[in-house]
């Protein structure tokens, strides 16, 4: 039996307070720090460890590199009656999302469908908190973004794509939304970083080494290239994200973002695209019937013992709200040391 990991137990309020202290200590404005602390706390709460308090190390590293503007104030520009663009001005993305969300919701409820573009942002976070926020308004949400070119196309050896996540949320009456958020790479970059940090091997289907050979060594994977999920299908979706979340919105592709970094190793700088749909506008008087169709499909999935996406997160959420979260002692100490 494996030895239990020495851990620190914190309430969610304590996690949020710790994140806020670390972020403001390193020069982030209160608005940026609160937006980031909110999402980091959500990640830790839902046991998404690669996007929980571990990301404080990532944020601070990027701030120390001098690329991110810790005081940037996002600005809004309406491109049309149903498209809003938020310029992050080289700040982290989360405050820009918070800034643009009310406008996206307003436009979607007016027109039935609307889009929000975030430009020139440093982006390190999961997308599910964002599409969940859209679903909390009774809307359907999709979000996507490129990153750094860490991922080789299927059949290739050289990195071209980012991890290029796609997230989707569907509101459910009286329950948690139907949500998925997955990288088009075989795994999130942060998971390989955590394996490297903990000295654990990775599955060979996650990555290739610098010579293009499948590897179980996370350090070799970080020096080589990640693989797409689902072979050519994942490759095609990754390319779609580059086009919609990069070229279409006038922002960097993953290769361009990597070049922009100039070897500094900061969080990727690029854009993001979020699209929202209002079921009330699409369905009108048939709204209840349309939502009921979705519920019947969900019932048919769980009735046979299958699990809806994000159910593991929702179960973890309930545990964390009741019992707090466990943070490995070594990681906790590393985070506290950021306050020195």
Swiss-Prot record:
It holds the Pfam family Ldh_2. Keywords: NADP, Oxidoreductase. Transmembrane segments: none annotated. Its EC number is 1.5.1.49. Signal peptide: none annotated. Substrate binds at residues 55, 163, 189-190. NADP(+) binds at residues 123-127, 181-183, 232-233, 307-313. The active site is at 50 (charge relay system), 51 (proton donor), 191 (charge relay system). GO terms for molecular function: oxidoreductase activity. It catalyses: L-proline + NAD(+) = 1-pyrroline-2-carboxylate + NADH + H(+); L-proline + NADP(+) = 1-pyrroline-2-carboxylate + NADPH + H(+). Catalyzes the reduction of Delta(1)-pyrroline-2-carboxylate (Pyr2C) to L-proline, using NADPH as the electron donor. May be involved in a degradation pathway that converts trans-3-hydroxy-L-proline (t3LHyp) to L-proline. Belongs to the LDH2/MDH2 oxidoreductase family. Homodimer. This is Delta(1)-pyrroline-2-carboxylate reductase 2. It comes from Burkholderia multivorans (strain ATCC 17616 / 249). The lineage of its organism: Bacteria, Pseudomonadati, Pseudomonadota, Betaproteobacteria, Burkholderiales. The gene is ybiC.
């Amino acid at each position: 039996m494996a030895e239990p990991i020495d851990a620190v137990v914190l309430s969610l309020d304590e996690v949020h307070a710790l994140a806020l202290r670390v972020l403001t200590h390193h020069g982030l404005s209160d608005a940026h720090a609160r937006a980031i602390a909110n999402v980091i706390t959500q990640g830790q709460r839902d046991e998404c460890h690669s996007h929980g308090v571990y990301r404080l190390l990532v944020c601070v590293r990027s701030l120390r590199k001098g690329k991110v503007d810790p005081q940037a104030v996002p600005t809004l520009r309406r491109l049309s009656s149903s498209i809003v663009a938020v310029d992050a001005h080289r700040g982290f993305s989360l405050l820009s999302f918070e800034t643009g969300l009310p406008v996206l919701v307003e436009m979607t409820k007016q027109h039935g469908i609307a889009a929000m573009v975030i430009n020139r942002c440093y982006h390190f976070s999961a997308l599910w908190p964002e599409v969940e926020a859209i679903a909390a308004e009774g809307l359907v949400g999709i979000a996507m973004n490129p990153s750094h070119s860490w991922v080789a196309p299927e059949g290739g050896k050289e990195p071209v794509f980012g991890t290029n996540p796609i997230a989707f949320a569907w509101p459910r009456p009286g329950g948690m939304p139907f949500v998925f958020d997955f990288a088009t790479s075989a795994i999130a970059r942060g998971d390989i970083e955590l394996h490297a940090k903990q000295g654990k091997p990775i599955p060979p289907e996650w990555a290739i080494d610098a010579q293009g050979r499948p590897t179980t060594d996370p350090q070799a994977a970080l020096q080589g290239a990640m693989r797409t999920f689902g072979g050519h299908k994942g490759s095609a979706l990754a390319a779609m994200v580059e086009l919609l979340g990069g070229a279409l919105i006038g922002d960097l592709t993953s290769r361009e973002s990597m070049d922009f970094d100039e070897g500094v190793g900061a969080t990727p700088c690029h854009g993001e695209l979020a699209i929202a749909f209002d079921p009330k506008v699409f369905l009108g008087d048939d709204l209840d019937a349309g939502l009921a169709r979705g519920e019947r499909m969900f019932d048919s999935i769980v009735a046979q013992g299958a699990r809806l996406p994000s159910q593991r997160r929702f179960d973890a959420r309930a545990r964390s709200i009741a019992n707090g979260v466990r943070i490995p002692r070594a990681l906790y100490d590393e985070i506290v040391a950021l306050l020195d």
